[in-house]
Amino acid sequence: MKHRTIINIFTGLALAAAVAVIALISIILTGKSHLYNAADRIVQGNNCDGDKTNEAVIFNREPYVYKKGLINILILGIDGEGNLYDNHSPGDMGQSDAVYVVSIDTQSKATHVVGIPRDTMTTIEMSDKDGNTVAVNTGQVTLQYGYGQDIQQCTSLMAKSVSGILYNIHIDRVVVLSVNSIAIINDAVGGVTVTIENDFTDESGEVLDEAFVKGNTIHLTGEQARLFVQERDCNVAESAMDRLSRQEQYMQALEQLLYKKVRKNPFLIMKIIKELKSNDMLYTDMTNAEIVYVFFR
């Protein structure tokens, strides 16, 4: 009887594991289908601003055309410590201090990340409290996010601006993270190791952390991670570019670590997403299946 019970337990565990694997495969395939369909649709169509994506761009007298089968995901990091879903007057919705486009090649499976400096000058649409465009000016791309009526319009305006900066590429999906999300993501993967390339302080000139000394290699935990990717001295020229370099270093290290962790535990990414969403630190139009596929493609 005892032997039979043990066999039943192992059989049950094996069935549960098989069901979990099948469910995971189903999720991955669903995510793949959704993203591939998005990539296929825009090859024949227009970008988010209605401009053709298949027209040649001339650079150094050489013509370049949009490559087929790319999935472009816009990632925005928003300053301020408030709720991403809080509605404010247009112009007060915050600024996007981190602007990145992650481009996934569905043919080669390669991933390319393009960081756009927050101070890049572009066309900025300003809207009223009803979401209607009332003015179009030239300004820093970081400002565009703040002129939406709500988070959906904020991200739509940013997608349009970034698309224009990058020769009208199509933006397929958007991921928006509040600055407070960094500590949660960082600690969920056990911390991220970085090297301090330059000394930096906040705008008051105070040292943010004793470990933030040029040349130090440190393992960031919690609040350290947020300080590393967010803070800069606004009174120092090129401090925004220095911060962009830190953000890129952090993102590369985090991507590699998160990829390894999620491959071992597929449900980790779902746990992180659930915590971020429950605290209103994440907005995205990606489905859970699409997010899981990104890590298992």
Which residue ranges define each predicted feature?
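Non-catalytic, solvent-exposed segments at the cell envelope interface
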Residues: K2-L15, A20-R297
